[in-house]
Amino acid sequence: MAFNIHNRNLLSLEHHTTRELRYLLDLSRDLKRAKYTGTEQQHLKGNNIALIFEKTSTRTRCAFEVAAYDQGANVTYIDPNSSQIGHKESMKDTARVLGRMYDAIEYRGFKQEIVEELAKFAGVPVFNGLTDEYHPTQMIADVLTMREHSDKPLHDISYAYLGDARNNMGNSLLLIGAKLGMDVRIAAPKALWPHDDLVERCKQYAEESGARITLTEDPKAAVKGVDFVHTDVWVSMGEPIEAWGERIKQLKPYQVNAELMKSTGNPRTKFMHCLPAFHNSETKVGKQIAEQYPDLANGIEVTDDVFESPACIAFEQAENRMHTIKAILVSTLADL
């Protein structure tokens, strides 16, 4: 069956087929190789891309900007402090303005409904750079990274996600694994599992792709024999420091530490994290938490010994944000 990603939105990956996702992965690989060998060709000259950031960002902003510049496109960075978004102008009206000036729009912010409203009214492709519910651009980078660090085909790769699984990373890792036929394991307290409706949809995708989906409250059972262990921060951006107490109580058994990595029984297991990571107390937030919870001074969701070990491929993963976002831009906007 033919497919066409040109001028398509990227909002959650739900509307992308397995074949389309594999195409994005292959294009990411090819563009990465071209950048490394100095043979990259610019396909986006004359394109203008708006980057809306209602949440702060390091990797997503840098990845979009460098990817666009490499391909000859121009970008405009827009945040709440430098625009009328949400203050004097609705997202609906913002979409109708920006859609007349730009060839595409990236949005990083809060509710999924906001990026969907933006896509509905902009009239140009919209890319979800992160919402509370989904993180699709991160997923393409994560799977590319897993493929680079495994000699197995995708359908034989297994990975576990530990921690708050109802957040954008838990939802998205479940979704893309189900779409690509992978062995996906989610380990979290039942109260923090992905919502039932998403789980049911992913089970349907798994029936089509051959994926294996496991949800469990047992972290050691989840990681047994896996190729990759993923985690994320226990409190998401924008949540108050007061929320940490209950979350730490819930998630301490799901901390990725040396004991947990050993319990995989696989010496080749790699550790992945979308970053930023609280793996020590050298950050402002890490220091605040360590003062209240001294046993977390050497790491919250992941301990420093794991993060600084050869098993950690989080920085390769971070670099791949740029290559995969470039593939998304090129496949959507270029005439290939």
UniProtKB/Swiss-Prot annotation:
<dbReference type="Pfam" id="PF00185">
    <property type="entry name" value="OTCace"/>
</dbReference>
<feature type="binding site">
    <location>
        <position position="108"/>
    </location>
    <ligand>
        <name>carbamoyl phosphate</name>
    </ligand>
</feature>
<dbReference type="GO" id="GO:0005737">
    <property type="term" value="C:cytoplasm"/>
</dbReference>
<dbReference type="InterPro" id="IPR006131">
    <property type="entry name" value="Asp_carbamoyltransf_Asp/Orn-bd"/>
</dbReference>
<protein>
    <recommendedName>
        <fullName>Ornithine carbamoyltransferase, catabolic</fullName>
        <ecNumber>2.1.3.3</ecNumber>
    </recommendedName>
</protein>
<dbReference type="InterPro" id="IPR024904">
    <property type="entry name" value="OTCase_ArgI"/>
</dbReference>
<dbReference type="GO" id="GO:0004585">
    <property type="term" value="F:ornithine carbamoyltransferase activity"/>
</dbReference>
<feature type="binding site">
    <location>
        <begin position="135"/>
        <end position="138"/>
    </location>
    <ligand>
        <name>carbamoyl phosphate</name>
    </ligand>
</feature>
<comment type="function">
    <text>Reversibly catalyzes the transfer of the carbamoyl group from carbamoyl phosphate (CP) to the N(epsilon) atom of ornithine (ORN) to produce L-citrulline.</text>
</comment>
<comment type="pathway">
    <text>Amino-acid degradation; L-arginine degradation via ADI pathway; carbamoyl phosphate from L-arginine: step 2/2.</text>
</comment>
<dbReference type="GO" id="GO:0006526">
    <property type="term" value="P:L-arginine biosynthetic process"/>
</dbReference>
<dbReference type="InterPro" id="IPR006132">
    <property type="entry name" value="Asp/Orn_carbamoyltranf_P-bd"/>
</dbReference>
<feature type="binding site">
    <location>
        <position position="84"/>
    </location>
    <ligand>
        <name>carbamoyl phosphate</name>
    </ligand>
</feature>
<dbReference type="GO" id="GO:0042450">
    <property type="term" value="P:arginine biosynthetic process via ornithine"/>
</dbReference>
<feature type="binding site">
    <location>
        <position position="232"/>
    </location>
    <ligand>
        <name>L-ornithine</name>
    </ligand>
</feature>
<dbReference type="Pfam" id="PF02729">
    <property type="entry name" value="OTCace_N"/>
</dbReference>
<dbReference type="GO" id="GO:0019240">
    <property type="term" value="P:citrulline biosynthetic process"/>
</dbReference>
<dbReference type="GO" id="GO:0016597">
    <property type="term" value="F:amino acid binding"/>
</dbReference>
<comment type="similarity">
    <text>Belongs to the aspartate/ornithine carbamoyltransferase superfamily. OTCase family.</text>
</comment>
<feature type="binding site">
    <location>
        <begin position="236"/>
        <end position="237"/>
    </location>
    <ligand>
        <name>L-ornithine</name>
    </ligand>
</feature>
<keyword id="KW-0808">Transferase</keyword>
<feature type="binding site">
    <location>
        <position position="168"/>
    </location>
    <ligand>
        <name>L-ornithine</name>
    </ligand>
</feature>
<feature type="binding site">
    <location>
        <position position="321"/>
    </location>
    <ligand>
        <name>carbamoyl phosphate</name>
    </ligand>
</feature>
<dbReference type="InterPro" id="IPR036901">
    <property type="entry name" value="Asp/Orn_carbamoylTrfase_sf"/>
</dbReference>
<dbReference type="InterPro" id="IPR006130">
    <property type="entry name" value="Asp/Orn_carbamoylTrfase"/>
</dbReference>
<feature type="binding site">
    <location>
        <begin position="57"/>
        <end position="60"/>
    </location>
    <ligand>
        <name>carbamoyl phosphate</name>
    </ligand>
</feature>
<dbReference type="InterPro" id="IPR002292">
    <property type="entry name" value="Orn/put_carbamltrans"/>
</dbReference>
<keyword id="KW-0056">Arginine metabolism</keyword>
<keyword id="KW-0963">Cytoplasm</keyword>
<dbReference type="GO" id="GO:0019547">
    <property type="term" value="P:arginine catabolic process to ornithine"/>
</dbReference>
<feature type="binding site">
    <location>
        <begin position="274"/>
        <end position="275"/>
    </location>
    <ligand>
        <name>carbamoyl phosphate</name>
    </ligand>
</feature>
